[in-house]
Amino acid sequence: YPVLESVKGQIENAYKILETCYENGGKLLIAGNGGSAADSDHIVGELMKGFVKRRPVSTELAEALKQADPERGEELAKKLQGGLPAIALTNHTALSSAFANDVDGMLSYAQQVNGYGKAGDVFLGISTSGNSENVMYAAVTAKAKGLKVVGLTGKTGGKLAKLADVAIIVPEQETYKIQELHLPIY
């Protein structure tokens, strides 16, 4: 994707942040709206299981599974895969609807960052404009809790680009074109 050459450095910086997070036992929290919510879910699907090649569980876990239940443990040891911890904040309908009803729906992602996030984790905010308020509230909460913030945006990068530790601002203006360029990045 030659069009992404201009954001190569930002992609590499985001990778380094994620690598450090995972090396230190952290997790990735992801949020977006509409197509960006779908991207959030897609990213989790790729990280929590093998992608391109199988990720076997550790020998220690395989043995513990067999010890816990020799019959099922053998199957689990063969079929489970190592995952990189990631949570799409877009999928918790009961929590989101209860928080929207009882408190403020705009803060649903922020509430989840508050509940799940810890220093050393990473928040990935996906917003084609960089100005989605609910994503911004989550990003502010993440920063306050000591999480690194990565923004995946387009256009000018918006408010999210200014707050993020790393902002990947794809060089497009139209929403569907921005979303098309987000896909090869993740």
Would you name each region that the model predicts?
Residues 1-5:
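Generic N-terminal amphipathic, Lys/Arg-enriched alpha-helix
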Residues 151-164:
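Short, glycine/polar-rich helix-capping loops at beta-to-alpha or helix-loop-helix junctions
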Residues 110, 127, 153, 168-176:
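Short beta->alpha connector loops at strand-helix junctions that form conserved
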Residues 176-186:
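A charged, well-structured terminal subsegment
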Residues 6-24:
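A short, well-structured juxtamembrane/interface segment
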Residues 20-116:
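Glycine-rich, small/polar surface segments that engage phosphate groups of diverse ligands
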Residues 37-41, 106, 131-138, 160:
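Short glycine/serine/threonine-rich phosphate/pyrophosphate-binding segments
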